[in-house]
């Protein structure tokens, strides 16, 4: 690929990456609000679960969220820059050491819990208070 084509492709990707999502990592519990089209109307559906993996590849970035629904594990892969994602909210910061949490697939009940990262939660709380004070 020539240098000109690479710069054109990079400019196109930069234009497509427009929306900023909150920072989240593996182990964090997130709520992903997804736009669902049913017939001629559109609604927003919440999908809450634990982020078990992320793939950072520019415009092709994605993340995988796992939740337990009616006793069964359900995983969904979301494209980070997709138009169907309305918003992402981080509910809880998890403290994990692994990059991919695929081992959670084999665990059930209390064994599948993830410890909360209290230091990150305290920093987020301080940031919210500082923002409220500035207003």
UniProtKB/Swiss-Prot annotation:
Pfam families the record matches: Ribosomal_L19
MF GO annotations: structural constituent of ribosome
Alphabetized UniProt keyword annotations: Ribonucleoprotein, Ribosomal protein
Gene3D superfamilies from the UniProt entry: 2.30.30.790
GO cellular component: cytosolic large ribosomal subunit
Superkingdom as given in the UniProt entry: Bacteria
Record flagged with keyword Ribonucleoprotein: yes
InterPro entries: Ribosomal_bL19, Ribosomal_bL19_CS, Ribosomal_bL19_sf, Translation_prot_SH3-like_sf
GO BP term (any one): translation
Family: Belongs to the bacterial ribosomal protein bL19 family.
Function: This protein is located at the 30S-50S ribosomal subunit interface and may play a role in the structure and function of the aminoacyl-tRNA binding site.
Name listed for the protein in its UniProt record: Large ribosomal subunit protein bL19
Source organism (scientific name): Xanthomonas axonopodis pv. citri (strain 306)
Gene name as annotated: rplS
């Amino acid at each position: 690929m020539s240098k000109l084509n690479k710069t054109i492709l990079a400019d196109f990707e930069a234009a497509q990456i427009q929306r900023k999502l909150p920072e989240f990592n593996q182990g964090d519990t997130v709520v992903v609000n997804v736009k669902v089209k049913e017939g001629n109307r559109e609604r927003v559906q919440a999908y809450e679960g634990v982020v078990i993996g992320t793939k950072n590849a520019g415009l092709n970035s994605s993340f995988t969220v796992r939740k337990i629904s009616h006793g069964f594990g359900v995983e969904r892969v979301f494209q980070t820059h997709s138009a169907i994602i309305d918003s992402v909210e981080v509910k809880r910061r998890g403290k994990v050491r692994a990059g991919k949490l695929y081992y959670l697939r084999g665990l059930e009940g209390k064994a599948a819990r993830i410890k909360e990262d209290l230091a990150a939660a305290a920093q987020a709380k301080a940031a919210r208070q500082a923002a409220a004070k500035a207003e």
